[in-house]
């Protein structure tokens, strides 16, 4: 239990660890965190729903149906929520369910209860958890914090929120799982310094580096893999067993479910014993822990590779890390503990049950948000996992909020029009680390119409990005002259590409140099074209301000610059642009003086009249 200095109980709060495999409930009661259990004293609730022609079965009752009714029994929905059908078919080619594309985004499950979405499935689980909590305390729950992986994207987070609303839960915050674990340990240990949270659950892996200082939890960086966890251990082990069975035919849904269940049982036993006797269909034998270690070693190394990349990215040496916290049921696997200990060169903390620590942190944070506790509130500074920006001329991405920026955050940048008399602006919102639009994730597009018709560069557009404490994004655009404004919340975007975030960051690092030079070259080309257009327009209006000799020189250098543009010769373009600016200096100076004189005469005329 985690003890808190709290004398007055004001409201009944709840922390929900919504897990891929299991979910947990916790609440602060009488100065301590209490983990809620069922009538059989089990604190783990399987995140499973069985849809039948009557009332859906949830949890342990639903788990009994996995083998008998795999098509209607939805497991690990957390891996599917907020995902497109293309992503799911690619990442999970063998699923026991019948699914189809949902026109509103995501997928639909075909069940005995009809078509249901991952949000519906999640809502049933959350509703069940809420009901069990009300029964446990015999009163209504006032507020709830739900935890999510740090690498859940905007669509996934929004889907969890919608599921909570559907379950009639008063959700006061979505809390990143690694941060939640740090809340639990931070309050218990009262430590200060750099802490790594290694979170390996059933379906996701996250690593977060946090700086703890006087009640402030600042997330310095996060990384992870949205599809790497204990479920993958089970899958690899089931394939290993399948080979031993020597079966020629492909397994059906029923056999596949049975095989996965057996693999999971063996995995759990191997966390305690060096060997396990197996009697499955036509095969009897022994599986040793060493065999299992060989099967899963590459996956564990993959998590450590992600850890290594994050430490390099935030320029942190292993020696400066004070503590390593282990979170998630999959960290019970002995090899995981051994490899993490070896990598970080220190024994990870496991004094709080890895299964329970996230729920404990959620309960503590929920209690503090509702101001039930008299102690100083902990300040959580989470970060955004990927940079956000908009498309600008040339197919570039202008980043407005950068990766690993603490949230909540609001940031504004000023832009202008690219063409004369432009009355419409299309804002294309993007997420990612690359320089070009084609290499980033498209989140949304929206249009601001009827802006003042003026010359290019005159109109001023303010673009504001906001990310709230739950990591949800909103974008506002304001045209300063007419005060026209438009704001959108990035929600269920059906064309959102659910790429693996670790892959995006890795690709941006590999291509950083090439992307930089490509952008510099393209920007120089755009600048050169822009200068040529401006100069041509100016000469049409005021060529009488200069001698024919000066005009000839300018025209000559214009031709040279145009040739450099056509040949896409960067260095020639750079040189010729500089020379054109030099020979045009006198003309532009005379033109500016003329315009200033005209402006003064007009003002004087206005005063006289």
UniProtKB/Swiss-Prot annotation:
Domain of life: Bacteria
InterPro entries: ATPase_NBD, Heat_shock_70_CS, HSP70_C_sf, HSP70_peptide-bd_sf, Hsp_70_fam, ISC_FeS_clus_asmbl_HscA
GO BP term (any one): iron-sulfur cluster assembly
Record's keyword annotation contains ATP-binding: yes
Lipid biosynthesis is among the record's keywords: no
GO terms, molecular function: ATP binding; ATP hydrolysis activity; ATP-dependent protein folding chaperone; unfolded protein binding
UniProt xrefs under NCBIfam families: HscA (TIGR01991), PRK05183.1 (NF003520)
Function (record text): Chaperone involved in the maturation of iron-sulfur cluster-containing proteins. Has a low intrinsic ATPase activity which is markedly stimulated by HscB. Involved in the maturation of IscU.
Entry protein name: Chaperone protein HscA
Organism from which the protein derives: Buchnera aphidicola subsp. Schizaphis graminum (strain Sg)
Organism classification: Bacteria, Pseudomonadati, Pseudomonadota, Gammaproteobacteria, Enterobacterales
Protein encoded by which gene: hscA
